[in-house]
Structure formats: structure tokens, C-alpha cells
Amino acid sequence: MITSNQNSKIKLVRALLGRTKERREAGSFVAEGVRLVEEAAKGDWRFEIVLYDETLSERGRSQVEGLRLKGVDVEEVSASVMKSLSDTESPQGILAVLKFSQSPII
């Protein structure tokens, strides 16, 4: 379990949340919430990492297990770390770092 805000994965997420330049350079962005992570899993998105905490719903936990079985890097974090990363008032307990699609926009 990740409990420190100084962890390299936490620093990556914070950078992606904070600066457009970081997202562009990394080719990644952050999706937060059970529904967004679920939709990304159904789609053709490439996951870099999924972070979740103990407040995650049963539906979300099912999603985490499915992603773990697919070989996605899934990490549990403390509730305080998740709250520090969350962009919402009441975090849903899950977020994912996804790679931008390589498909050209027509």
C-alpha cells in the first residue's frame, strides 16, 4: 500500500493533474471515478497505472480485479493519499493514468 505523497507514482499522477505540458509530454492523462475507469476498460485505452483506496465500492473492486488480471499495474493507496490526488469533493476511491490514443483526429 502506498502511504506517502513522495512516492514516484503519486508524483507522476500529481504532475499529470496539474500541468498540461506534463500530460502532453507524457502522452498520458488521469481519469477519476468508477464510471470513467470502467468505460476506459471497455474501450481501447492503454492503462499505465490504477490507484484505489479502501473506500472503493464493490463495483469498483470488481473493476480493479479485472484490470489486475489483464496485467495492469494496480496499487492500493491510503485514503489520505487518494484525497490529496482527487479533483472532486467526495472521491470515489479510484483513478487511472491512461495513455492518449494514437489514432489521428480526422
Task: Please give the residue ranges for each predicted region.
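A glycine-rich helix N-cap at a beta->alpha junction
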Residues: 66-87
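Structural motif
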Residues: 28, 48-50, 73-75, 92-96
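A generic structural signal for short, non-catalytic loop/turn and secondary-structure boundary residues
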Residues: 24, 45, 67-70, 89-91
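Fold-independent oxyanion-binding glycine-rich loops
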Residues: 34, 54, 77-79, 98-100
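Short, glycine- and charge-enriched coil/turn segments that flank and shape catalytic ligand pockets
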Residues: 44, 55-73, 102-106
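Boundary-proximal intrinsically disordered activation/regulatory segments immediately upstream
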Residues: 1-63
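Hydrophobic alpha-helical segments and helix pairs
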Residues: 81-106
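Generic secondary-structure transition motif, activating predominantly at the C-termini of alpha-helices
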Residues: 14-21, 68, 86-89
